[in-house]
A protein has these predicted regions:
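Nucleotide-sugar donor-binding/catalytic module of glycosyltransferases
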Residues: 1-118
Length: 118
């Protein structure tokens, strides 16, 4: 399983196109874990709309606000267990074959150098 990790903070203007781009991926075996850092705009409302449409999108909550993006990603890494991890920012836009191309390249490297190669 592929875990996509996203940290958000006041990303209302950007997050919808990013979520749509993730939903359009050619590989479907993924779960998106989102940790919001205390947004005061409509970011959580936009995320909730997508959660209702797709069970692969999860909002992971904790009681600490303003961890910052780097600490939010580290927090998610400690909470999520997966075969592969991908990181995305709220203002990214992924081409439809991003996951497919990434996994394909990683598989090639693992075959060449062994599975313990990061």
């Amino acid at each position: 399983m592929i875990a996509i990790l996203m940290a958000t903070y006041n990303g209302e203007k950007y997050i919808e196109p990013q979520l749509k781009s993730i939903l359009c991926q050619t590989i479907r075996d993924w779960v998106l874990y989102i940790r919001d850092d205390g947004s005061t705009d409509r970011t959580l409302s936009v995320i909730s709309k997508f959660i209702k449409k797709d069970i692969r999108i999860k909002l992971v909550s904790d009681t600490v606000e303003h961890r910052g993006a780097d600490n939010s990603f580290m927090w998610l890494l400690n909470k999520v267990n997966a075969d592969y991890y991908m990181f995305c920012d709220q203002d990214d836009y992924w081409l439809p074959n991003k996951i497919e191309n990434t996994i394909s390249r990683m598989d090639s490297i693992e075959k060449e150098r062994g599975e313990s190669t990061p």
